Structure formats: structure tokens, C-alpha cells
């Protein structure tokens, strides 16, 4: 039986939604229909050890910076806790990370073996939630670990992305 183009696209969209790396075959936990920057999306059920977040995109042609934040909600006043902020700074070629709990920023970490991002090139960032840290993998290479500063992993339920990049996939 032949399917119309609309039916085929709808079926493919449904398959993509249910086969995301953060989902079980039965229920989608993370589904982002529009990937515009700045981006804010909900992570159903929050984080837990074993859960992975995938961010794929393309760095803009003349980038200054971009950041990825995992937060405990999206409140602005009072500001939600930031479990991890990853910030790529192109002028200094740094990939910085920090957390902000109860309105107080911790000590910023900056040591990396190399700067993985290139202007006008695609990238793949994986944030693995493990016990007791986040493991950050860029383009298949482990770059660093960042120890949890937020006590309740399940409270980390929002992802925010901003800056000089185009998003192509989240999962």
C-alpha cells in the first residue's frame, strides 16, 4: 500500500521522537520540535545516573562564544540553580564549566587537553550523567569530568543553549 508524502513524513517524525537516545521505546522523555537559539527545553523526569544528553550543531562562521546549561527549572526570579554551565570561548580557545547553587557561583574549571570547536564546523557534545559527576564527550573524545554540585539530580530538568551556534539535533 502506497503512503502519501505527508503520511511518510509523519511516520518518520514519530519514529525519530520515539527513538531518541534519552527515550525508552514506549515513552519519549525528551522531544524538541524546534531547535532555535536561544533554546530552552524540558528534560522529563530530570537527570539520573546513566542518562545522556546529546547536543549536535554547527558553530557559526565568526563565533565569540556559546553556552549549554543544565538547570533546575527555568525560573528567572529567583534564578534556578545551574547544575552545569559549559561555555565555549573562541577568542581564548577555552571550554569553561561551572555551577551556580543558591545564587552563588562555584569555582570555574578550565583545564582541557585541547579546544574541540572550529568555526563553521559541526560538533557533537554528549553530557553523561554519572555518579558522582558529569562526563563531557565532544566528537567522540572524553574531554573532562565535572563533579556534581547540585544534590538532587532529578531536579535538573531543563536545558538552555545560547550563543553562536545552530542546533541540528538534541536527544
From Swiss-Prot:
<dbReference type="InterPro" id="IPR013320">
    <property type="entry name" value="ConA-like_dom_sf"/>
</dbReference>
<dbReference type="Pfam" id="PF00337">
    <property type="entry name" value="Gal-bind_lectin"/>
</dbReference>
<dbReference type="InterPro" id="IPR001079">
    <property type="entry name" value="Galectin_CRD"/>
</dbReference>
<keyword id="KW-0430">Lectin</keyword>
<feature type="domain" description="Galectin">
    <location>
        <begin position="38"/>
        <end position="170"/>
    </location>
</feature>
<dbReference type="InterPro" id="IPR044156">
    <property type="entry name" value="Galectin-like"/>
</dbReference>
<protein>
    <recommendedName>
        <fullName>Galectin-related protein A</fullName>
    </recommendedName>
</protein>
<dbReference type="GO" id="GO:0030246">
    <property type="term" value="F:carbohydrate binding"/>
</dbReference>
<comment type="function">
    <text>Does not bind lactose, and may not bind carbohydrates.</text>
</comment>
Amino acid at each position: 500500500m502506497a503512503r502519501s508524502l505527508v503520511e511518510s513524513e509523519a511516520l518518520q517524525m514519530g519514529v525519530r521522537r520515539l527513538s531518541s537516545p534519552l527515550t525508552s521505546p514506549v515513552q519519549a522523555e525528551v522531544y524538541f520540535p524546534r531547535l532555535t537559539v536561544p533554546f530552552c527545553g524540558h528534560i522529563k523526569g530530570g537527570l539520573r545516573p546513566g542518562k545522556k544528553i546529546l547536543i549536535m550543531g554547527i558553530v557559526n562562521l565568526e563565533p565569540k562564544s556559546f553556552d549549554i546549561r543544565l538547570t533546575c527549572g527555568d525560573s528567572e526570579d529567583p534564578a534556578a540553580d545551574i547544575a552545569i554551565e559549559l561555555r565555549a570561548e573562541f577568542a581564548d580557545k577555552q571550554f569553561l564549566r561551572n555551577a551556580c547553587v543558591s545564587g552563588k557561583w562555584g569555582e570555574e574549571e578550565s583545564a582541557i587537553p585541547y579546544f574541540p570547536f572550529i568555526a563553521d564546523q559541526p560538533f557533537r557534545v554528549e553530557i553523561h550523567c554519572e555518579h558522582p559527576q558529569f562526563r563531557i564527550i565532544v566528537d567522540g573524545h572524553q574531554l573532562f569530568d565535572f563533579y556534581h554540585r547540585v544534590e538532587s539530580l532529578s531536579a535538573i530538568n531543563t536545558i538552555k543553549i545560547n550563543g553562536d551556534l545552530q542546533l541540528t539535533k538534541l536527544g
